[in-house]
């Protein structure tokens, strides 16, 4: 019996080490801001049972943000601003986008079943981990699924009472059938 219990304990610790989210270059906190203004803070958020694809480390998210900013700039050029307007992302000292990794304590099914309202599950979840700065808009790249939509954002009338509607989510890989 002791051998069996020892085997279970060793297996648990080995599994924890193999599936650890800690990797070189990964940030688990919002790094100090390079300016004290309002910013868009980007987060790579996984559900408890989500598979880590290293999107925060392999430039997938950075390139996505670059493309979004490029599109936004092209749509504002010669309309509102002569040279266009850029989005103000939260940046690190080296001018790269500050991307925070967070694994939630909620399974994907519990989040994805809420469809377009899933962002109203994600926002309080990230807030419990301290991501609730009133000067930030949280842009979540959610590494799980959603049954209805590929993205959603909070509307003040749907946000939990006492919570600032400051979160948008992109469900990547996205919508799933079911």
Placement of each model-derived feature along the sequence:
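Propeptide-to-catalytic entry region of secreted or membrane-anchored zinc metalloproteases
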Residues: 21-137, 141-156
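Positively charged n-region of N-terminal signal peptides that target proteins for export
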Residues: 1-4
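Active-site scaffold of zinc-dependent metalloenzymes
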Residues: 148-178
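Bacterial N-terminal signal peptides
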Residues: 7-15
């Amino acid at each position: 019996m002791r051998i069996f219990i020892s085997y279970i304990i060793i297996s648990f610790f080995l599994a924890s080490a193999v599936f650890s989210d800690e990797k070189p270059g990964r940030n688990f906190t919002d790094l100090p801001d390079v300016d004290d203004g309002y910013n868009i803070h980007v987060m790579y958020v996984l559900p408890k049972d989500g598979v880590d694809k290293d999107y925060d480390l392999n430039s997938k998210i950075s390139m996505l943000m670059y493309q979004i900013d490029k599109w936004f700039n092209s749509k504002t050029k010669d309309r509102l601003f002569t040279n266009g307007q850029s989005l103000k992302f939260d940046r690190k000292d080296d001018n790269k986008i500050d991307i925070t990794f967070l694994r939630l304590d909620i399974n994907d099914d519990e989040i994805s079943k809420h469809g377009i309202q899933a962002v109203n599950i994600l926002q309080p979840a990230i807030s419990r981990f301290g991501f609730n700065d009133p000067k930030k808009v949280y842009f979540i790249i959610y590494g799980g699924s959603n049954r209805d939509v590929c993205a959603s954002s909070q509307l003040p009338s749907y946000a939990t009472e006492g919570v600032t509607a400051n979160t948008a989510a992109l469900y990547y890989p996205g919508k799933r059938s079911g």
